[in-house]
From Swiss-Prot:
The keyword Lipoprotein does not apply. Its cofactor is [2Fe-2S] cluster. InterPro entries: MvhD/FlpD. Binds 1 [2Fe-2S] cluster. Keywords: 2Fe-2S, Electron transport, Iron, Iron-sulfur, Metal-binding, Oxidoreductase, Transport. GO terms for molecular function: 2 iron, 2 sulfur cluster binding; metal ion binding; oxidoreductase activity. It comes from the Archaea. The F420-non-reducing hydrogenase vhu is composed of four subunits; VhuA, VhuD, VhuG and VhuU. This is F420-non-reducing hydrogenase vhu iron-sulfur subunit D. The gene is vhuD. Pfam families: FlpD (PF02662). Belongs to the MvhD/VhuD family.
Length: 134
């Protein structure tokens, strides 16, 4: 089986810095991750409607700022609630709420970024391919 496709919606302020540092530090993680930089993870619901699981990603994670570090003040808290709701919806649809997760990190958390990628890859392998994949 090919590596599962993981979409990572990463905050420009924090998650992107962690992903960039992971790359420049030559940290190892599956190449099947698709990082999508967003201005703030608080806008995640919009991106989820047009990308991610509906488009066939096997798993999705959101990498947002740590609590009280969001440049937009509450973006990371609002997305945390949206991720919880999305998990419930995916469970009700029979797709699996474990296909989505929220991770908090700073721009210096390269290790946290690679752990998130690896965790979501392992989850996607256990869950199998996204049933919405064409």
């Amino acid at each position: 089986m090919a590596e599962p496709i993981i979409m990572a919606f990463i905050c420009y302020q924090c998650g992107y810095g962690a992903a960039d540092l992971a790359g420049t530090s030559r940290m190892q993680y599956p190449a099947s991750v698709r990082p999508i930089r967003v201005p703030c993870t608080g806008k995640f619901l919009y991106y989820l409607r047009i990308k991610g699981i509906p488009k066939g990603a096997d798993a999705v994670f959101v990498a947002g700022c740590k609590p009280n570090e969001c440049a937009f003040e509450t973006g990371n808290f609002s997305v945390e609630e949206r991720v919880k709701m999305t998990k419930q919806i995916l469970d009700e649809m029979g797709i699996g709420g474990d296909r989505i997760e929220m991770f908090f990190m700073s721009g210096a958390d390269a290790g946290k970024f690679t752990e998130a990628v690896n965790e979501m890859t392992d989850r996607a392998k256990k869950l199998g391919p996204n049933p919405l994949k064409k």
